[in-house]
Amino acid sequence: MIVTESFLPALNGVTTSVCKVLENLRARGHDALVIAPGTSPWSPTMTPERYAGYPVHSVTSVPVRQFRVGLPSYEIETVLHRFRPDVMHVASPFVLGVRGLTAARALGIPSVAVYQTDMPSYIRQHSGPAGNLTARAAWRWIRRIHQQADLTLAPSTAALHDLRANDVPRVALWGRGVDADLFHPDRREDPQTQALRRRLAPHGEVLLGYVGRLAPEKELHRLVELARVPGTRLVLVGEGPSRELLESQLPGAAFLGRQEGLDLARAYGAFDLFVHTGTRETFGQTLQEAAAAGLPVVAPARGGPLDLVEVGVTGQLFDPDAPGALAAAVRPLVAPGAAAQRGAMGREARRRVVERSWPALVDQLVDHYATAMGAAAVSVA
């Protein structure tokens, strides 16, 4: 059973991860059921009733800052009694997932909690002068949540360190997979990708691409630095509440909106360099997709990117506290004659991620399920 704080139609890292896990569990013949936030009077778009052949049980939700938050409900116990899973997988537990973990522990069902969202940093950002105080309170809540799990999985070494530093017990590392067939350097030769490049770079500009939510927590204000880098053009893929502000700050940039599947892969194929700005990423899935597409990556030297980018080999890391550091990291990679360097970095970036397929990562996840089941059996004994 998977209890998730986010699911379709919302598109984000939590949803993508859960969907890929379900697809690969189906391919291995496992049985599963999903509990997810459903529709509400304020958010009427439907949550699917099934995914990858598995039933999806929706619970009442309320909107919070454009996110659906599933309300804790005794429905979870009812579903648990009926389904009787061998293990419960809780994706990014914070509200709905807490109820899932509590119910699993009460019924003696082993549980694996997947830590995916740096909620303390997000809360700090939106709490003004009380930011540090509220962040500490968030960590106390996270510790209380994850103490109920038999195993907590962190997506990166930075996240693993944060969890351990805040006394979260029983933590292990589990990364994320990438579809290296969809995100592939050959997309660059696709006629539709070539047409997109001609439209975006009519004068041969070097295209600097960003993919992700257009929202304050992504710290996209840093992109203003890049507007002054000659011979380049920014291309942003994604939607969010910051789009109107960014369009005014970046009048020369191209905004492609939300893209999925092959259209997203072609967008990566059109880029020459991938840039990321946020410092609160527990992993950084779009960085991994860019690497699979054969792109060098420039990202902050903080959080998930530390695992994904090797300086001077697969891209560059910049100091997010130093004004102008992003532009300084980008300039050498877009200078005349730098195409060969970008190509070499992109090839090495792809070589390193190509084996991180979702099938391989779900095999690791199933091993973690077995570990949690063994730990639960020992604690009962």
Regions found by a protein language model. Give the residues of each.
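N-terminal subdomain of nucleotide-sugar transferases
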Residues: 1-57, 358-366, 370, 377
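A short, well-ordered alpha-helix in the C-terminal region of glycosyltransferases
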Residues: 341-355
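Conserved donor-binding/catalytic core segment of Leloir-type glycosyltransferases
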Residues: 197, 201-231
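Aromatic "clamp/platform" in nucleotide-sugar-dependent glycosyltransferases that forms part
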Residues: 279
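Short alpha-helical donor nucleotide-sugar binding micro-motif in glycosyltransferases
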Residues: 80, 145-146, 258-259, 266-271, ...
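Conserved acidic donor-binding segment of nucleotide-sugar-dependent glycosyltransferases
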Residues: 311-312, 316-323, 332-338
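Donor nucleotide-sugar binding/catalytic pocket of nucleotide-sugar-dependent glycosyltransferases
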Residues: 36, 139-194, 202-203
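Short hydrophobic beta-strand element within catalytic cores of glycosyltransferases
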Residues: 296-299
